[in-house]
């Protein structure tokens, strides 16, 4: 295998990938690095990357501000620490609106399963979760308090991704969003700020949802399964932060986030690598993201089309079709 200037020399699963210069490459005189080695990092030892960087074994390394060794690393590398600018990749929390698998769950009865499903199909309930989510506290588990705002995104499609008629995409969305209800009028969609978190609004939206759901026979608290890679401390910390902010805002008597600690392989198999929606074994998942293929908002939206989107199972827990009842319930065929 080769990619032009380099030939694959070796590939060892969960260890390393090595490439060497391709002497038959047409422009080989401009390939100045003869050998490239990519090392696998499983996220467990948060001091490993900084140590390797200090030993000149890595040309760059990620630091973990919440790790136990960060204070010493900050002193040692203070003149070399930078924050990576936000790009067009967006990472979100997916909502499984049509869950079928319950191998990894805290739910004990079919009644609990149905109550959670009905809750996630309720717009006011989903909005309550969104307003209860402290994105800054969540981001701080990865970037530290000082760097948390640098990775916050409040829109799935970046607000400055495109412009039209002198307005950014975010400004155009905000104009429409304000017409959906008073709860949205004070929100801010710009990157780099905690523009959706509002515990008061979360409580108000939840109160509306609870009234409607109790009329449907839903029992509280709603138990929400959220899987995480148990071997990666920063990922566990983020999910714990999400749990804390949601339960504090809405009350444990109303909503409980049940963290499902899984191996990396099990997590991948019930999220991204699940062969179909029947294998998507979760209620909410932060193992979801997308990078654009071209400069148009449709590159983000087409993958979520209810009838044909390639990623409806990963983001929303259902296989694309013309007649999914859950997708109908939340209005996905209306767009």
Give the role of each language-model region.
Residues 5-142, 163-335:
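Extracytoplasmic/periplasmic ligand-capture domains
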Residues 153, 157-162:
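Surface-exposed loop and adjacent secondary-structure segments within mature catalytic domains
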